[in-house]
């Protein structure tokens, strides 16, 4: 079933990669619970859900971009797909994880080192601001694939956007901070 996705698009219902990532994560948790409860039926259902979720996630892979896209049937990149690395869907040592991260950087990384959620037009036009949660996901993904020095550098950059009491806003304009 299609949905509005993490970013709650008002006029765009798709099969979002992020949604299926959480189906996959939920299936892993359900498998663990089934083992503890010795519930074979639950275990089989969890495995079925996990297999279906993996299938849907893989349909989001864009061979041309060497990364996972926002949804099935589109090549649009979405920073929420950084979570494929952070949640260990992708093996962090794999070429695919590293290529996916590079694709994300190429498409969504701003000149100030922060990250856009996505770059395509939405209900309000083309995005003008980066989202700080995406920058934190980026830092985590860098650390996961072993790019620790860069992770520290970008984390320090993000902290620089806090106000006098250490609070961060949801978004930051790339041009004027």
Q: Model-found features: residue ranges?
A:
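Hydrophobic, well-ordered secondary-structure segments
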Residues: 20, 24-27, 47, 54
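Inter-helical turn/loop segments and adjacent helix faces that build the functional surface
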Residues: 2-10, 29-48
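Well-ordered alpha-helical scaffold segments within catalytic/enzyme domains
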Residues: 22-39, 83-93, 136-150
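Secondary-structure transition/capping residues
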Residues: 34, 41-44, 64, 68, ...
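Aromatic- and histidine-enriched alpha-helix N-cap/loop-to-helix transition segments
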Residues: 14-25, 75-79, 129-136
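Extended glycan-interaction surfaces of carbohydrate-active proteins
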Residues: 1-10, 51-132, 153-177
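Alpha-helix capping and helix-loop boundary segments enriched in small/acidic/polar residues
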Residues: 7-21, 41-44, 72, 126
């Amino acid at each position: 079933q299609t949905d509005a996705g993490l970013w709650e698009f008002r006029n765009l219902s798709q099969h979002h990669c992020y949604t299926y990532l959480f189906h996959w994560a939920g299936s892993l948790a359900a498998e663990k619970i089934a083992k503890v409860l010795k519930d074979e039926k639950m275990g089989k259902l969890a495995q079925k859900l996990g297999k279906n979720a993996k299938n849907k996630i893989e349909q989001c892979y864009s061979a041309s971009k060497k990364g996972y896209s926002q949804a099935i049937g589109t090549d649009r990149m979405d920073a929420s797909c950084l979570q494929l690395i952070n949640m260990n869907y992708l093996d962090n040592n794999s070429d695919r994880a590293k290529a996916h991260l590079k694709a994300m950087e190429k498409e969504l990384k701003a000149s100030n080192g922060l990250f856009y959620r996505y770059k395509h037009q939405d209900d309000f036009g083309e995005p003008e601001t980066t989202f700080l949660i995406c920058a934190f996901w980026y830092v985590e993904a860098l650390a996961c694939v072993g790019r620790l020095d860069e992770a520290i550098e970008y984390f320090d950059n993000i902290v620089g956007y806090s106000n006098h009491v250490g609070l961060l806003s949801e978004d930051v304009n790339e041009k004027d901070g």
